[in-house]
Each structure stands twice: as C-alpha cells, then as structure tokens.
Amino acid sequence: MAFPYVRDNRLEITCGEAPYIVSRYDTTTGAAIPIEQRIGILDRKLRIVSENTETSGEWLEWAQEAYKSTYAYEWQGDNLLIARETMLVTFIEYYQQKFGKRPLLKSINYIAYIISWNVWQMDGLKGVVPNSCGERRTLVYELFGTKEDVSQCEGCAKDDIRRHNGTYCLIKDWRAKDPKTGKMGKRIRFIDLIK
C-alpha cells in the first residue's frame, strides 16, 4: 500500500479530548458521529487503511502505522485520559466496522501501548511534566552547621525551554532504532524536536 498520508506525522497541541484527532462525537451536543462522517486526523488515516486493505493482518499493520505517526499532548490529566480512551475506542470501532468482530486483546493492548507514548501530559510552554519544575532546596553542610540553599528554575526565570529543572517529556520516534535496546522506537525528549 503506497499511501504516505497514513505515515505522515501529525501533532495536536493542547489536545483536550482530542476532537481534531478523532471525532467520535459532536463536542457541542455530545451526539455520536457515524464512522463514515468522522473527520479527525486519525479518522482519515483509518478510513484510508480500511479502504485499501483486505486482511486483518494488513489492516492491523497499517493501523499501527497510523497511530505511531499521530501525536498529542495535554496539560490536564482528566482530558488526557479521555483523549487516550477516545483514540483506543476509535481503533476498536474501525476494526469492527471492517471485519464484523472485535480485534484480539493483544492488538488492543499494542495500540494502547502506542497511545501511551504518543499522547502524553505536558506543559506546552515548558516541555516538562506539569508542575515538575520550580525552586530546588538543598542542604549544604558546612564546618559550623548546615544551611539551606534555594535555587530557582533557570528555565522559568529566563523563559528558556531548554533550561527547566522539571521532568522533560519523552516520546518515541517509532522509525528510529533505540541504541540501548536495538529495537525500533527510540525514546527522545519532545523538546529536542524543536529547532
């Protein structure tokens, strides 16, 4: 199958419940949207996969490619959970529509694994896990006692995304080999993608 769009990397920033990735329901009314009328980024990719594959194995291979190239981040954990759940249910719905049955649990679990790497919680202005950076306190032991040394986050003070002392978010580049494991799916810091 030669459909480069399925493998094109796409990112939804501050994704909320990910309505631009998957459009399972109308966000204003809550009404379900039939699969044929869905217009999200991943919906379009899965529609292309469904229209151009015959076997379950071929469909799963290309659906995995579609998920591996679709990314999103969100600051709020509750929205992140809904976004991930919506993407997972979308996988099941498209598979059921194509083959008339649910996918195997191992297939569902693998898509969930991909989603867990590709849809993550992040403060988009800092590139770190929300609320993970700030002042750091360390005890300094001296000859006549101890004192507390307080240092501020340099990234916050200088508005420099590369100098935060918080936990930087990791994602996977599914097409690059991880030097530690030798397997495809290299772990990278999201901010390292920013030029």
Segments (PLM) and residue ranges:
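Conserved S-adenosyl-L-methionine
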Residues: M1-G127
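A Trp-anchored, charged/polar loop motif used as the substrate-binding/catalytic surface
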Residues: M1, E54, D173-K195
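Intrinsic-disorder/low-complexity loop/linker signature
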Residues: G30, D43-L46, G134, G166, ...
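Conserved proline-anchored active-site loop of SAM-dependent methyltransferases
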Residues: V6-D26, T70-I82, V119-V128, S132-W174, ...
